[in-house]
Amino acid sequence: MKLPSSIKNWVSITGAILAIFNLATILSLFILSSLFEFGGSYIGLFIYMVLPAFMIFGLLLIPIGMRLNRAQARREEAAGEVRNWPVLNFNNEGTRNAGLIFIFGTVFLLIISSIGSYEAFHYTESVEFCGKLCHKVMEPEFVTYHGSSHERVACVECHVGAGASWYVKSKLSGLYQVYSVLAHKYPTPIPTPIANLRPARETCEKCHWPEKFYHRKIKIEESFLADDLNTEQVIHLQMKTSSKMTSGGMENGIHQHINPDVRIEYKTTSDNRQVIPWVKYTNLKTGVSEVYTDNENQVSQSKLDSLENRVMDCLDCHNRPSHNYNTPQNFVDKLISAGKISKTLPGIKKVAMEVLYPEYSTKDSAFMAISEKVNAFYNSNYPDIVISRKSDIGNAVAEIQNGYASNIFPYMKASWKHYPNNIGHMEFDGCFRCHNDRHATASGKVISKDCNLCHTILAQGTPDSMQYSNAFVPLEFKHPVDIDDAWRTELCSSCHSQLY
């Protein structure tokens, strides 16, 4: 096969060698990864991204070299000269020395650049890179991550996961995020990237999987009323996190939603998935399906048809697994329960709620307001303990400030108000998005909000006046403050979403 004489140059030859070498490497790695699972999770990154980039670069060098040498090749052809391939004469001392320098220099640079690329790759995968590079912008996510149960799971394990395709998506998304930070184009607060998150079955189920059986769990909740005595309320819940195997498959329990024998689909009319007008339940064993619609939030069929049909997974309930912004009533209760704030300080829960209710423009102004208002409260209402319990008051101020700094971020306008937590149903609708006695089938079957579906109450009351259930009959919930039967008809979040 005759080739144009302009291809007989070192640039084109180098490009051809580079392209052929990388093509051979790609094919070899592809065969090894396919047959022997060689290379781990990120071998696809090199097969589909890194090596093809070098191969394309080599292919581009071929026409570049031809272009650079085309004029000289034409002159030689016009003169009747035959253009030969370049010759490396290693008998020539200068050529030999240059060749050795080139070979060893190239090997050395490849080793150094490989180490650098490897370290750079792992740095971009680190928690410090994700959380600290854009410190102010990512501070809310970084701080809440370090207070979560997934603190020892690297960001990329969930946000990227294994495989080259999601790695590419994350880096392309990251380029825009870098631009947004440099150009100050980022929104405040940053919206949760619900549409761009990797499916939970590809990340969460690496550690948590539906087929695994869990025992029921006892959850003890301690809360304090906003009264002068900080009245303590205790409730013992048995959470139905377990399942049981029946002749029809796995049934019952909170995790029925992700039962492998069941598919639950829903449609939402809100970007944050807080409003769900349509739910479909399908028993995959029998093929029987039931459609539930919200009778207080009717949506036209044409509108429903235009909405995404989403299959329920872990993140539809566990939507804040690593970045949970606790509500003030929750983090203050935890501080009092842990003894970090003395529960014998009169009215401390009440004043904490009062100082945490306003929105502050900066963290410094919030800290100053917390200190001033707490001290003013005790100076005005309890002057007799201002001196005798000065250290307790000062410690309470410091702990309220720490709770604020860990959950509320004025610069990014990030707090519980913008990031609802779907676990539970106290401050946010959570479970009650569907379990509200409003979603019903055409035959009248409803999605119940019966408390005992997900948990049973084993004990409740104040520490000195506890009420206990027997082995077979759970307790009926008793609201700490007498609100008659309003708790039966109203959603908890109707009141508890506000500070009190």
Sequence positions of predicted segments:
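Alpha-helical transmembrane segments and their helix-start/interface "positive-inside/aromatic belt" motifs
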Residues: K2-A19, M49, G99-F102
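Alpha-helical transmembrane segments of multi-pass membrane proteins
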Residues: I20-S33
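Sequence context of c-type cytochrome heme-c attachment sites
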Residues: S34-I56, I62-P199, K217-S306, F331-K340, ...
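Divalent metal-coordination and catalytic microenvironments
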Residues: G58, Y145, C207, C317
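Short cysteine-rich clusters marking metal-coordination/redox-active sites
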Residues: C130, C155, C204-C207, C314, ...
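Helix-to-catalytic-loop junction in kinase catalytic cores
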Residues: H159, H208-E211, H318, H435, ...
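Extended, compositionally biased alpha-helical segments that mediate assembly or anchoring
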Residues: W487-H496
